[in-house]
Amino acid sequence: MLTPVVSYTTVREVKGPLIVIEKTRGVSYGEVGEVIGPDGEPRRVQVIEVGTDYAVAQVLGGTLGLPAKGSTVRFYGKTLKIPVSEQLIGRILDGKGQPRDHMPLPPPEDFRDVNGEPLNPYSREYPEEPIETGISAIDGLYTLVRGQKLPIFSGTGLPHNLMAAQVVRQATVRGSEEEFAVVFVGVGIKTEEALFFMDEFRKTGALRRAVAVLNLASDPVAERILAPRVGLTIGEYLAWQLGYHVLVVITDMTNYCEGLRELSSGRGELPGRRGYPGYMYTDLATIYERAGRARGRRGSVTQFPILTMPHDDITHPIPDLTGYITEGQLVLSRAMWGKGIYPPFDVIMSLSRLAKDAIGEGKTREDHKDVANTLIAAYSKALEIRNLATLVGERNLGWRERRYLRFADAFEQRFIKQGYYERRSFEETLDIGWDVLSILPEDELTNARPQITQKFYRRHIFESVQL
């Protein structure tokens, strides 16, 4: 049990999730302690601002029923650390790292600071090995790479929760004898969503290789800020100490940013764009930059954060700043979802900056780059022709243009669309890609190398298409 270094009874104000302590000396930023109200119940606190003679601390257990008068604050001279262990795999925790599954925590193997240990940029290795998610739109076009941070930009009402559960269930590292684990972090999610994830992980067996950190919307806002860091701290321990390849799935980072804005408002800070704090970019970077690979270490940390864009606005500060930090984005389309296509990816708006270095011969298959480049280019042209057809009518188009319309329909219905419980390997994804590309004339596939087209093009499919 920790011995308090100093105690204060000078709580000046309780404001939302924050308390202000006066006449402080020697209290450090990030230091943890506890506040004890008149009822004698201790609540964990963490210092988030230090002045000349005062300190502001966030109460991780919430301030409901906590008065300023009669409360005592004790500080321990230490930063916030959580117990970590390999035996956390298979467990469900809350946003503070405490059990949510009504079972005791396993014996700790170590205690780790939730803020992590930054990787020396010189020691980072460039990500070059793929992660197979089993989802064709990701694996085929925008491959997720070990050590990458690749977010999903979604919108209210779109199936990002289904996608998160599917990725947790299906993701794997192929051809590797090294261990693979998933850390799932739910940030500010509703009880209904938490029950869905817990039931889904248990029912499908995904929990056997996963750690779930669930912070509910009804939990204190300070815990919402802590939850992603708890999940990443567990993931970093599994990766850097035990050699696991860890995929960290975080949903919903919009809830995190809303919590950040609430805390900033409570501290009386000058707001930035749309009321969010001016340091939100830096704060998000402290989360996203914890992904990567390190020279001399076997493991890796890959991040797959999900955020909902308010009003589907990709220029909103949350997706805007996220895009500056991460290495691409996967954008979900409301129009595709309206067509009944799952997962409803917006192929043209999506991007993975590292995918080109993690695909090809020896990694996925020799034709992977050719398929991805050709599919995207052909679909982009097909969308232009589809718009033209709405003006002049399909009957007035040439036979090549009509081929592109058939290709676009097949691409959406056969390549992009797949079942929630359907898992496709890289080979299956690429084979479907060639099936839909073969609707087009062979001389239209200019983004593929001639020798690759000659080897994989399905001429019998081209000849069987009815116009």
From Swiss-Prot:
It is a peripheral membrane protein. The keyword Heme does not apply. Keywords: ATP synthesis, Cell membrane, Hydrogen ion transport, Ion transport, Membrane, Transport. It holds the Pfam family ATP-synt_ab_N. Coiled coil: none annotated. InterPro entries: ATP-synt_VA_C, ATPase_F1/V1/A1_a/bsu_N, ATPase_F1/V1/A1_a/bsu_nucl-bd, P-loop_NTPase, V-ATPase_su_B/beta. One of its GO terms (molecular function) is proton-transporting ATPase activity, rotational mechanism. One of its GO terms (biological process) is proton motive force-driven plasma membrane ATP synthesis. Its main location: membrane. It is found in: Cell membrane. Residues 95-114 are annotated as: Disordered. CDD domains: ATP-synt_V_A-type_beta_C, ATP-synt_V_A-type_beta_N, V_A-ATPase_B. One of its GO terms (cellular component) is plasma membrane. The keyword Transport applies. Has multiple subunits with at least A(3), B(3), C, D, E, F, H, I and proteolipid K(x). Component of the A-type ATP synthase that produces ATP from ADP in the presence of a proton gradient across the membrane. The B chain is a regulatory subunit. Belongs to the ATPase alpha/beta chains family. NCBIfam families: PRK04196.1 (NF003235). This is A-type ATP synthase subunit B. It comes from Pyrobaculum aerophilum (strain ATCC 51768 / DSM 7523 / JCM 9630 / CIP 104966 / NBRC 100827 / IM2). The gene is atpB.
